[in-house]
Amino acid sequence: MTGSLEKTHYLRENFNFFILNAMDDWVRIIDDRGEVAFVNDALIDALDKSETLKTYLDDNIDLLLSNSNEVVKTTTMIEEKLIDGKYYSIKTSPIFYDGDFAGTIEVYRDITSESILKIDLYNANKDMIDDLRFVRRIQASILPKNKTYGKLKISGIYNPSEKVSGDIYDLIKIDENRSAFYIADVMGHGVKASIMTMFLKVSMSAIFDKHPDYSPSQVFLNLRKKFTKLEIDSSQYFTAWLGIFDFRDDSLVFANAGHNCPPLIYRQSEKIADYLLVSGRMISNIIEADKYKEKTLKLEENDKILFFTDGTIEAKNENGKEYGLERLREEFSKKGDIQALYQNIRDFNWQQMADDLTLALIEYGGNDEN
């Protein structure tokens, strides 16, 4: 076995100290006895200016070469330390002579700028996440509460794929005899889509406030005018479904603006769910305005209408198969309960939802609790 003095001689005579002295990084070599075999010029200069650094380096020798610290004799270690107000990346590697552990070489690199940048990025990211959580709370708070509004009992589930969502639904009281309900899905996710949902809520309320006698088709045409005036990216669009309930004759007049998730109506008398279908184009500033066809439906006591967005039917199982419209219709026909339906979708889904999932159920014929 090689002796310690021979190892120290090897360390002092076999390294290219010219290269190490040319480095801006601090470098020192410690033999297996804990003696300093070499310190490069950059570290010598730093030691002359800092007692704190001297103390740290002395303490570090004892830590590195303690009997319990066997890992330093076999493995390269990298850690970050704050020394004299600066951040350093410290790389410690074992040195071997004739197969035996001879000592360690330490390289201290100043990474203060990088560390400050990482801290700034972390804080900025934290602020952004806090802002997104705030927006999400606002989004959730502007949705109708799960309660009864006149003859309409509403229950909803709002589950964004990200912190904020591009889905929205709302109930608007037009007058004592009529209420409007809409659901919309803005293209994309995140902050941009969530801001668009705010635009939709404000715009829809303003339209009904100014034009209470508008039909669903007229509302969509007016909404499109407001949207095109924004002069935003031509790739931005949204889909929506709008219905106006008239409690005087128990009728529902509805129109569709490209919403590819037609609501499902479940009638107690028929014990099966069916689609509320009507054609219409999505609202976009690159697609010409549509006339938006309307249909009228006679409602019965205890009818249930399920509203949803495409994240619901696009949930996938482990084989990549989508939940789909027909499965949703069948499950809604069997269950008729929004919580049970939501659980069925979650059980079917194999991974994190790729899109926002929004469900809203209206039961017709409840008592007024307002």
Predicted regions and their residues:
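Conserved acidic
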Residues: M1, D110, D185, D310, ...
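Sensory modules in modular signal-transduction proteins
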Residues: E6-D41
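Sensory coupling linkers of modular signal transduction proteins
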Residues: T2-Y10, I95-K126, I313
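PAS/PAS-like sensory domain cap-loop motif
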Residues: L43-T55, S194, D209, N317-E322
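C-terminal catalytic subdomain
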Residues: T76, K298-F307, T312-N370
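Terminal output helix/cap of sensory domains in signal transduction proteins
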Residues: T52-D84, L341-D347
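… and, occasionally, acidic/histidine-rich disordered N-termini of signaling adaptors
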Residues: I83, Y87, D120-L306, Q352-E369
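N-terminal capping loop/helix in small sensory signaling domains highlighted by a polar->aromatic N-x2-3-F motif
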Residues: D31, V39-S50, G258, T309
